[in-house]
Design a protein with these regions (language model features):
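Alpha4 helix (beta4-alpha4-beta5 surface) of REC/receiver domains from two-component response regulators
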Residues: 59-63, 83-114
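Two-component/phosphorelay signaling modules centered on CheY-like receiver
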Residues: 10-30
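Acidic, metal-coordinating helix/loop segments flanking the phosphotransfer/catalytic sites
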Residues: 30-48, 56
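Conserved phosphotransfer microenvironments
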Residues: 52-68
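Hydrophobic alpha-helical motif in two-component signaling modules
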Residues: 41, 50, 64-65, 74
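His-Asp phosphorelay/catalytic-motif detector in bacterial-type signaling
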Residues: 45-47, 73-78
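Non-catalytic signal-transmission and effector/linker regions of two-component phosphorelay proteins
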Residues: 1-11, 106-122
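Receiver (REC) domain switch-region micro-motif
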Residues: 4, 49, 68
Length: 122
């Protein structure tokens, strides 16, 4: 089964994203902090990473994206940002994300569309 790393500190949103991933046929691993996203991605080699832009931790959200992009073994795994930021702001901050999910209105149809945009087959 394909795996998805979900980087989200809010337990409610993490559960919602986990449910969306399961409906899309993806197994999930939850990472509550930025450094956990990087470590778990190195371990499980997911097909996609969905993470909060402002994820807490010793490596925060945007720093985690940069760390993922700097690692040759995992740099090609698409990252979808889940954030309160507007999509234009996300694109301006980090041009290397594959998609964006807008909080607080997280809908399954948007989740599916973000996966397709990221090139993830479901």
């Amino acid at each position: 089964m394909k795996t998805c790393v979900i980087g989200e500190a809010d337990p409610f949103i993490a559960r919602l994203l986990k449910r969306f991933a399961a409906e899309s046929g993806l197994q999930t691993v939850i990472a509550p902090a930025g450094q956990d996203v990087v470590e778990l991605t190195r371990q499980v080699k997911p097909v996609v990473i969905i993470m909060e832009a402002e994820l807490p931790g010793t490596i925060r959200g945007w720093e985690a994206v940069r760390a993922l992009r700097a690692d040759r073994e995992i740099c090609n795994i698409p990252v979808i940002i889940c954030s309160w930021l507007q999509e234009a702001n996300v694109d301006a901050l980090v041009g290397e994300v594959a998609g964006h999910l807008q909080k607080p209105e997280l809908l399954y149809t948007d989740f599916e569309a973000a996966l397709r945009k990221a090139g993830v087959e479901i």
